[in-house]
Amino acid sequence: MVISRAEIYWADLGPPSGSQPAKRRPVLVIQSDPYNASRLATVIAAVITSNTALAAMPGNVFLPATTTRLPRDSVVNVTAIVTLNKTDLTDRVGEVPASLMHEVDRGLRRVLDL
């Protein structure tokens, strides 16, 4: 499977545990393409939620369903970054346009103080 940055996939994040994201939900690949193309078995992603109220949180990015092919309007939660096995990514949903990825990158820089 060829995985690219800015793609959205469904992933099983496992059972709920504290405040960690869980269950089957969409994730946005944020790892760079050279790493995606490498022999690494893992991928870094940001969790996507349909709780659009989280768009008000600094750094989070609103994703319109019409732009991403998600079933409903959603939000990239830049504070919910996960490392997954590439095999945990199942159905490809779509891709985040460059303009919104720029906002995601800005949010990641903010939350990680880069």
Curated annotation (Swiss-Prot):
Q: Which InterPro entries match?
A: PemK-like, Plasmid_toxin/cell-grow_inhib
Q: How does this chain assemble? A: Forms a complex with cognate toxin MazE6, which neutralizes the toxin. Interacts physically with non-cognate antitoxins VapB27 and VapB40 which neutralize the toxin.
- Keywords assigned by UniProt? Endonuclease, Hydrolase, Nuclease, Secreted, Toxin-antitoxin system
Q: Where are the transmembrane segments?
A: none
Which processes are annotated in GO (biological process)? Answer: mRNA catabolic process; negative regulation of growth; positive regulation of growth; rRNA catabolic process; symbiont-mediated perturbation of host process
**What phenotype is described for loss of this gene?**
Individual deletion of mazF3, mazF6 and mazF9 have little to no phenotype, but a triple mutant shows increased sensitivity to oxidative and antibiotic stress and starvation, decreased formation of persisters cells, and a decreased bacterial load and pathogenic damage in infected guinea pigs.
Q: Name one GO cellular component term.
A: extracellular region
Which Enzyme Commission number(s) are on file for it? 3.1.27.-
To which protein family does this belong?
Belongs to the PemK/MazF family.
General function of this protein: Toxic component of a type II toxin-antitoxin (TA) system. Upon expression in E.coli and in M.smegmatis partially inhibits cell growth and colony formation; its toxic effect is neutralized by coexpression with cognate antitoxin MazE6. Acts as an mRNA interferase on ssRNA, cleaving between the second and third bases in the sequences CUCCU and UUCCU.
Tell me the protein's name. Endoribonuclease MazF6
Any idea which GO molecular function terms this record carries?
Answer: DNA binding; RNA endonuclease activity; RNA nuclease activity
Is Transcription one of the keywords UniProt gives this record? no
Query: Principal localization?
Result: secreted
Alphabetized PANTHER family for the sequence: ENDORIBONUCLEASE MAZF, ENDORIBONUCLEASE MAZF-RELATED
Q: Which organism is it from?
A: Mycobacterium tuberculosis (strain ATCC 25618 / H37Rv)
Cellular location of this protein? Answer: Secreted
Induction of its expression = Strongly induced (17 to 25-fold) by nitrosative stress, starvation, when grown in a non-replicating state, in the presence of gentamycin or rifampicin.
Query: Is Hydrolase found in the keyword set?
Result: yes
